């Protein structure tokens, strides 16, 4: 499994990079689960990582606003993100999801076809009035997306595993692979979840709180990144 770590500033990005994260993900927790950070923060992180890892950037938890989302996605791509990640928050239908993701993918790939688009559903989709992540792989593949992900929409300490069990997450992973997509699992994951994640087999796991000592509002600790990297390689 690859490890995606989500710093919020330059200093944390250096720690995540030196700790051995496979992907350095720029987000802004103050603006939500997949809250967008500023373009200059993405550029700054890109500079300090200096090619050691690809950069991912979130553009927000989006309802049905394809124009706004596609413009935000292009902004993240121009700022230097290699992966552009959008959350499908309060998306009511597969048709809405398809149009949103198609327009985002067009905006990104028209600028640079090598950049990857990540579509995130939410394990707690019933709490946030959105579509099931299990519907996402087929829609994302049709839209030309590269990676599908599941995360928690409401960051209240509850884990993805409290909303989707091992069987459902394995189904999500298998559906992604059947559609030729990479997949990622995130959402208040803990070290004790690693054996289950190994059985599920996602390509990527996304963390913040786990490498902050359990509280995503505190700073990332390099020794915890290193510990997680080591355990992911066992």
Swiss-Prot record:
Keywords: Lyase, Schiff base. Pathway: Cofactor biosynthesis; methanofuran biosynthesis. The active site is at residues 27, 85. GO terms for molecular function: carbon-carbon lyase activity. It is an enzyme of class 4 (lyase). Its EC number is 4.2.3.153. One of its GO terms (biological process) is methanofuran biosynthetic process. InterPro entries: 4HFCP_synth, 4HFCP_synth_arc, RibuloseP-bd_barrel. It catalyses: 2 D-glyceraldehyde 3-phosphate = 4-(hydroxymethyl)-2-furancarboxaldehyde phosphate + phosphate + 2 H2O. Belongs to the MfnB family. Catalyzes the formation of 4-(hydroxymethyl)-2-furancarboxaldehyde phosphate (4-HFC-P) from two molecules of glyceraldehyde-3-P (GA-3-P). NCBIfam families: PRK02227.1-3 (NF002575). This is (5-formylfuran-3-yl)methyl phosphate synthase. It comes from Methanosarcina acetivorans (strain ATCC 35395 / DSM 2834 / JCM 12185 / C2A). The gene is mfnB.
